[in-house]
Amino acid sequence: MNAYTVSRLALDAGVSVHIVRDYLLRGLLRPVACTTGGYGLFDDAALQRLCFVRAAFEAGIGLGALARLCRALDAANCDETAAQLAVLRQFVERRREALANLEVQLAAMPTAPAQHAESLP
């Protein structure tokens, strides 16, 4: 098992230490052990979770929804985990539809300034 400090976890995930500490306060991450000095230690699963949470957040999923999923995972509550995953999948599907619609709109945009001026009322 790799043991990560907060700073090493942040470095390996490509985020700041402040983000890791914020996620700890929100319950998105939990240390698996503590040093004698009281510092949290994290494992590979924590690194994987941090990378997932960050990717989901960057995709537009709120930290509240991610915290609900993490709480369900930490409690080993299969029903709640499944429910939270379903919510996230619905969000992803809606986001895909919105992006597809945006792509259609972008394709219809005039590319030359003269075309744009002619299309204005």
Swiss-Prot record:
The lineage of its organism: Bacteria, Pseudomonadati, Pseudomonadota, Gammaproteobacteria, Enterobacterales. CDD domains: HTH_MerD (cd01111). Residues 3-72 form the HTH merR-type domain. Keywords: DNA-binding, Mercuric resistance, Plasmid, Transcription, Transcription regulation. It comes from Serratia marcescens. This is HTH-type transcriptional regulator MerD. PROSITE patterns: HTH_MERR_2. Residues 6-25 bind DNA. NCBIfam families: coreg_MerD, MerD. PANTHER family: HTH MERR-TYPE DOMAIN-CONTAINING PROTEIN (PTHR30204:SF93), REDOX-CYCLING DRUG-SENSING TRANSCRIPTIONAL ACTIVATOR SOXR (PTHR30204). It holds the Pfam family MerR_1. Transmembrane segments: none annotated. The gene is merD.
